[in-house]
């Protein structure tokens, strides 16, 4: 099997993937600021890391996936003021929308830490930075990270020129340097606040991710994700804070960033007003199509929204459903044969070669569009060859492969489970076979075996009634 390789934004190279602890992958992804409905740009981040996690799990790793919820922030406070609502209510409303969206997209996150539930840890972390001389308290009571104390600043984003570091201009008058950034924001009237040793206030944005990732994943972990829009300043700042506080290098082994969902040549963004909310997209195209659409482009590339590209994803999804139904039908009807001819062997080899290329694509910097192209070849093989040569072994192998593909795609779950009706039919068929064999046993006067079958089935509520040579049966409800 292919070794997994992944692109690391920090080194700008595709690297061999080796987690800090063998077999255990710790992954942190920057989640949403819950001040508005999620749009289809956010959905890409959710789906890409979920699919990556599923692939790593398929390759035998245990993955712990943490995604934070930013439930206190300038954007939430502003929204609360605009709408004259409590900031907690705003956060609650859009957290619900976020969690519902994940459910629809079939994204499973292991832990969802919220900032407001980690204020104590945030204060302790800031205190460490102050004690170690990396942070200073301004006269207002705000606390800033002193960027000049961390020599590696700018490496992640490739901004080696300090001129390009300037941020949080509104605090410029009290910062030592224009590029220092807030760890703690002093309280202003009308704003939520918590008590801290240097005065009441609330956490800055970047500190939460350093704190919550280390709280759940330890002081060093494997994958840190989020959109490319977060590389500067957010991830640059997170890295500076964490490496300064822990003295561990590297804090994160692989920085993995997803490209932006674009509207034409612009990033899809609330502030530009060019968004499509996820909940509308679900109604229009369905979550499965959307999930596949995200995977049609390489995760590092921008993904430009067009109706045509979504329609293509929809067609692909319909074909996947159709191939699933075909395989299920064949698996019910296929005959088990003990012999295999050369033609069968060739098809079996083709199936296994497809499987191998599926893994080759995904293990090489998680190339999902290539994996989808390989699955497309698989579908053609089922429709053009296996359908007309439904040997049990070929059908079963195809079924197994489809399940394996879906482990990553995550769009066929409802088609791959047997429905209650299908299970009923299966059970009826199995009982009929047992009853038939029992009739033969009775004909051969092997009454002890026949009686044992009747009493064993009886224990499971299946009652056999003999009348002469014939046997009828019923299920005790
Ligand atoms: N257009 C987009 N395409 C892909 N990912 C995006 C897009 N916009 C935001 N993200 C990602 O979604 C996650 C949550 O982002 P966050 O809540 O900070 O978004 P935001 O910046 O508030 O959105 P907006 O720019 O629309 O206001 C982050 O990982 C971010 O990188
Ligand atoms: Zn973050």
Curated annotation (Swiss-Prot):
Gene Ontology annotations of biological process type: cysteinyl-tRNA aminoacylation
Statement: the UniProt record of this protein carries the keyword ATP-binding: yes
Pfam families named among the record's database cross-references: CysS_C (PF23493), DALR_2 (PF09190), tRNA-synt_1e (PF01406)
Motif ('KMSKS' region): 267-271
SMART domains assigned to the protein according to its UniProt record, in alphabetical order: DALR_2
Gene3D superfamilies, per database record: Cysteine-tRNA ligase, C-terminal anti-codon recognition domain, HUPs
GO molecular function: ATP binding; cysteine-tRNA ligase activity; zinc ion binding
EC top class, as a word: ligase
Gene Ontology cellular-component terms listed: cytoplasm
Ligand binding (ATP): 270
Cofactor note: Binds 1 zinc ion per subunit.
Binding site for Zn(2+): 30, 209, 234, 238
UniProt entry keywords in alphabetical sequence: Aminoacyl-tRNA synthetase, ATP-binding, Cytoplasm, Ligase, Metal-binding, Nucleotide-binding, Protein biosynthesis, Zinc
InterPro entries per record: Cys-tRNA-ligase (IPR015803), Cys-tRNA-synt_Ia_DALR (IPR015273), Cys-tRNA/MSH_ligase (IPR024909), CysS_C (IPR056411), Rossmann-like_a/b/a_fold (IPR014729), tRNA-synt_1_cat_dom (IPR032678), tRNAsynth_Ia_anticodon-bd (IPR009080)
Record-listed E.C. numbers: 6.1.1.16
Top-level taxon: Archaea
Subcellular location: Cytoplasm
PANTHER family noted in UniProt: CYSTEINE--TRNA LIGASE, CYTOPLASMIC, CYSTEINYL-TRNA SYNTHETASE
UniProt family annotation: Belongs to the class-I aminoacyl-tRNA synthetase family.
Name of protein: Cysteine--tRNA ligase
Chain's gene name: cysS
